[in-house]
UniProtKB/Swiss-Prot annotation:
Protein's name according to its UniProt entry: Cell division protein ZapB
Entries under Gene3D superfamilies matching the protein: 1.20.5.340
Gene it is expressed from: zapB
InterPro entries in the cross-refs: Cell_div_ZapB
Keywords (A to Z) from UniProt: Cell cycle, Cell division, Coiled coil, Cytoplasm, Septation
UniProt cross-references to Pfam families, sorted A to Z: ZapB
Main subcellular location: cytoplasm
Family to which the UniProt record says this protein belongs: Belongs to the ZapB family.
Length: 79
């Protein structure tokens, strides 16, 4: 009788150990995925900053061209 109880207890302990091992593996996978996603976020932020800078430069260029065009149109009206 006590041998059967010991076997059941041993099986439950082994099941708990197996579950813990699987959960530890899952935690490691999730940590790796989290690190990968954090890197992707950093890359996206860098790309965003570069695009914002480019957008700012293009807006400035557009403003300069609009001023030149307005000046040319003003000269054409004078003629």
């Amino acid at each position: 009788m006590s041998f059967e109880v010991f076997e059941k207890l041993e099986a439950k302990v082994q099941q708990a150990v197996d579950t813990i091992t699987l959960l530890q593996m899952e935690i490691e996978e999730l940590k790796d995925k989290n690190n990968q996603l954090a890197q992707e976020v950093q890359n996206a932020q860098g790309s965003r900053e570069a695009l914002e800078h480019e957008n700012h430069q293009l807006r400035e260029q557009q403003h300069v061209w609009q001023e030149r065009l307005q000046a040319l149109l003003g000269k054409m009206e004078e003629v």
